[in-house]
Curated annotation (Swiss-Prot):
GO terms for biological process: regulation of translation; translation. It holds the Pfam family Ribosomal_L1. The lineage of its organism: Bacteria, Bacillati, Bacillota, Bacilli, Bacillales. SUPFAM superfamilies: Ribosomal protein L1. GO terms for molecular function: rRNA binding; structural constituent of ribosome; tRNA binding. It comes from the Bacteria. The keyword Ribosomal protein applies. Keywords: Repressor, Ribonucleoprotein, Ribosomal protein, RNA-binding, rRNA-binding, Translation regulation, tRNA-binding. One of its GO terms (cellular component) is large ribosomal subunit. Binds directly to 23S rRNA. The L1 stalk is quite mobile in the ribosome, and is involved in E site tRNA release. Belongs to the universal ribosomal protein uL1 family. This is Large ribosomal subunit protein uL1.
Length: 230
């Protein structure tokens, strides 16, 4: 661990903590300061001027990144009849109804995203205590409770990411891997920033995007000039 710590310290020296870099410069620095030996995830963090305790300042949704995240998402769809067939045809990894509910209750979690048709939510709701804390519960706001299972599965497989403000007003979103071309990471970064601007709550006062940073899984954070994300 000491060796990794030393690498991180050396990498951090390349970042001027007082500076706010352009999106392009920040992405270049993130790659330069990546200390992981694997293809690390690049994550953007937004500190927003909202009060998540207030219902009218909750921010939650999903967006399809133009270049995906570099991660293959395993999709579980709760559906029956024709909708189950549609989900299978769209490329869902697992499709079923009540059979998977029992499996999950017994500790099975070999999936990354859960989609459910509205008529299945009465049953899927039983998994609230299990899926909720893991952020896996289907939700209409993120497009994962829908009869259009084909669209839902296609978007997830194409690189759809969910975002949700935490109690401190922060949102963390993966924007790709360090192996991505700089331009693709920047475009993904700008896509999520633009989306968050569009969903700004009317009740939010003062500066909305207070601070934005980007970092690789094991690298230091790089502060970004918000104006360069427009």
């Amino acid at each position: 661990m000491a060796k990794r710590g030393k690498k991180y310290v050396e990498a951090a020296k390349l970042v001027d903590r007082a500076a706010a870099y352009s999106a392009t410069e920040a992405v270049e620095l993130v790659k330069k300061t990546n200390t992981a030996k694997f293809d690390a995830t690049v994550e953007a963090a937004f500190r927003l001027g909202v009060d998540p305790k207030k219902a009218d300042q909750q921010i939650r949704g999903a967006v399809v990144l133009p270049h995906g995240t570099g991660k293959v998402q395993r999709v579980l769809v709760f559906a029956k009849g024709e909708k189950a067939k549609e989900a299978e045809a769209a490329g869902a990894d697992f499709v079923g109804d009540t059979d998977y509910i029992g499996k999950i209750q017994q500790g099975w979690f070999d999936f990354d995203v859960v989609v459910a048709t509205p008529d299945m939510m009465g049953e899927v709701g039983k998994l609230g205590r299990v899926l909720g804390p893991k952020g896996l519960m289907p939700n209409p706001k993120t497009g994962t409770v829908t009869f259009d299972v084909t669209k839902a599965v296609n978007e997830i497989k194409a690189g759809k990411v969910e975002y949700r403000v935490d109690k401190a007003g922060n949102i963390h979103v993966p924007i790709g891997k360090v192996s991505f071309e700089d331009a693709k990471l920047v475009e993904n970064f700008k896509t999520i920033a633009d989306t968050l601007q569009k969903v700004k709550p009317a009740a939010a006062k003062g500066t909305y995007m207070k601070n934005v940073t980007v970092a690789s899984t094991m690298g230091p954070g790089v502060r970004v000039d918000v104006s360069t994300l427009a």
